[in-house]
Design a protein with these regions (language model features):
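Non-catalytic alpha/beta scaffold blocks inside enzyme catalytic domains
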Residues: 1-134, 196-263
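Long, low-complexity segments enriched in small/aliphatic residues
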Residues: 118-212
């Protein structure tokens, strides 16, 4: 199931429990009311996190997890480069790495996981995934390897030099059919909401709201074009209520020509 389908199933009652790891869905999902309805209807919710957050407020059990600085493993970036991450500190208090948590829960359920550490997980991935066949912690070293990695450890800094892995050797381009927006302006909702990003925060701020960045940008505001503001009697600094089919919010307005009329 996709996430919206999981939430629908929780509301309907066919999904009765969830285990959410490292994802503050009650903060980051665009339809928060939908999420709240789903989480509130669960019979059992486990949240595995490094901090308490909006999602953990619905949890029956919170499993304290280690941050990325407190656990070893690997990550792969958009350059196809796999790199080793080494823990710089031990997890505080009762916090444990994700692998330790999964191992302990699995053991209590009667199945011992065959991993003593992230090296064993990487070995299994290499055994099951041809593109990672030659990957080991030792070979990754300080600079990592770019997959595909042959069994002898040779990696692929350039993925395609002369042709693509297709019968004719050429890339495929496909035209996608037009899909109208999910919501359009109407008599009841005449304006279109455009959500954006702020330099000071990463995405919806589930991480950066816990840093000094909050002093640089502590709250959101609504930008509205002067034409729309005049029609609605709104001035910069006014606190306005914004309503949609999904929910409502009270927020400070800023009148600016940065935004187009009707948005």
């Amino acid at each position: 199931l996709k996430m919206p389908e999981m939430l629908d199933a929780a509301i309907e009652g066919s999904i009765k429990a969830m285990w959410i790891c490292g994802y503050d869905i009650a903060q980051s999902d665009p339809d928060v009311d939908h999420v709240v309805a789903a989480l509130s209807n669960l019979e059992f919710l486990v949240v595995q996190e490094i901090f308490e957050n909006e999602t953990s407020s619905f949890a029956h059990v919170i499993l304290p997890a280690a941050s990325f600085l407190e656990k070893s493993g690997t990550f792969t970036n958009a350059e196809r480069r796999m790199q080793v991450v080494q823990a710089a500190a031990s997890p505080p208090g009762a916090a444990k790495t994700d692998l330790e948590i999964y191992g302990l829960i699995s053991a209590r359920l009667g199945h011992e996981l065959p991993y003593e550490g992230p090296e064993d997980v990487m070995a299994e991935i290499a055994d099951l995934t041809p593109h990672f066949a030659g990957v080991t912690f030792e070979r990754l070293g300080r600079r990592g390897l770019q997959w595909p990695v042959a069994a002898d450890g040779t990696d692929s800094p350039v993925l395609y030099e002369t042709a693509f892995e297709l019968p004719e050797g050429r890339a495929h381009f496909a035209a996608l059919p037009y899909k109208p927006p999910g919501d359009e302006a109407s008599e009841d909702y005449p304006l279109i909401l455009v959500t954006g990003r702020r330099l000071e925060h990463y995405n919806v701020g589930t991480m950066t709201r816990r840093t000094g960045n909050l002093e640089l940008f502590s709250s959101d505001w609504l930008e509205i074009h002067p034409e729309d503001a005049q029609e609605l009697g709104i001035a910069s600094g006014d606190v306005v209520e914004v309503r949609s089919k999904k929910g409502r919010i009270e927020i400070e307005a800023q009148v600016t020509e940065r935004i187009e009329p009707g948005h």
